[in-house]
Curated annotation (Swiss-Prot):
Subcellular location: Cytoplasm
Native source species: Salmonella newport (strain SL254)
Positions of (R)-pantoate binding: Q61, Q155
Function according to Swiss-Prot or TrEMBL: Catalyzes the condensation of pantoate with beta-alanine in an ATP-dependent reaction via a pantoyl-adenylate intermediate.
Keywords in alphabetical order: ATP-binding, Cytoplasm, Ligase, Nucleotide-binding, Pantothenate biosynthesis
Protein name according to UniProt: Pantothenate synthetase
Length: 284
């Protein structure tokens, strides 16, 4: 496994891979890797000749400076995990390599609508940062496929739209959420949880399950369903941030013709902002 930190060396290897006709898969990450990331790697390995994992804590997508400072950086441990998984390349650039002139005045990529709705409304600039760094990685690495987790449901939808709108010839693969045995979605931010909070954390998944049961049963009183869910989370020790029930295909409000719904949930537990989602097939 080769660790690459500079753009010239990355470009040199990408040119060689292209000359050899290799099928390249990209797994973009911010590091602090867990089993969910390893599932992305496994999916990439199954679909390509060469797997490149990027590890870059992208300052452009953090809406809170303290969150950027606190974000876990575990490059050595991450590389050890990826080496055991027989990943071919790790691209781990410094911030100065990606943004040599700083963020002020940096050209960015913005996906209208999806960037500012739902999660984007509560985290201004976040999705603009995501689409910009992903676009830069696509331009640098020129992958045939790229793997993203379905845990970040809106992010995946945004990237799919960006790829379509910008005419990238890249297959976007969504990989299902990996959960702990108690249902908690794996996330790098779970590291912020205390031992006591970790016991409470699966409550977010349990609340989503109860919402799903109501939707499957035909209940469409969405405001009431959401209010009950938020109250339940707050009683469990969470601070409910945002719960939405949307059309899974458009992320717009549900209509009578919607075939699938997605429950999008975000809640604070101590210093950790947990997000999760669940899709539901609706009775027609």
């Amino acid at each position: 496994m080769l660790i690459i930190e500079t753009l010239p060396l990355l470009r040199q290897h990408i040119r060689r891979l292209r000359q050899e006709g290799k099928r390249v898969a990209l797994v973009p990450t911010m590091g602090n890797l867990h089993d969910g990331h390893m599932k992305l790697v496994d999916e990439a390995k199954a679909r390509a000749d060469v797997v490149i994992v990027s590890i870059f804590v992208n300052p452009m997508q953090f809406d809170r400076p303290d969150d950027l400072v606190r974000y876990p950086r575990t490059l050595q441990e991450d590389c050890e995990k990826l080496n055991k998984r027989k990943v071919d390349y790790v691209f781990a650039p410094a911030v100065e390599e990606i943004y040599p002139h700083g963020l002020e005045g940096q050209t960015y990529v913005d996906v209208p609508g999806l960037s500012t709705m739902l999660e984007g409304a509560s985290r201004p600039g976040h999705f603009r940062g995501v689409s910009t760094i992903v676009s830069k990685l696509f331009n640098l690495i020129q992958p045939d496929i790229a793997c993203f987790g379905e845990k970040d449901f809106q992010q995946l939808a945004l990237i799919r739209k960006m790829v379509a709108d910008m005419s990238y010839d890249i297959e976007i693969v969504g990989v299902p959420i990996i959960r702990a045995k108690d249902g908690l979605a794996l996330s790098s931010r779970n590291a912020y949880l205390t031992a006591e909070q970790r016991k409470i954390a699966p409550g977010l998944y349990n609340v989503m399950n109860r919402i799903a049961e109501k939707l499957i049963a035909g209940n469409r009183e969405l405001q009431e369903i959401i209010a009950i869910a938020e109250q339940e989370l707050n009683e469990k020790g969470f601070r409910a941030d945002d719960i939405q029930i949307r059309d899974a295909d458009t992320l717009l409000e549900l209509t009578e013709t919607s075939k699938r719904a997605v429950i999008l949930a975000a809640a604070w537990l101590g210093q950790a902002r947990l997000i999760d989602n669940q899709s539901v097939t609706l009775a027609q």
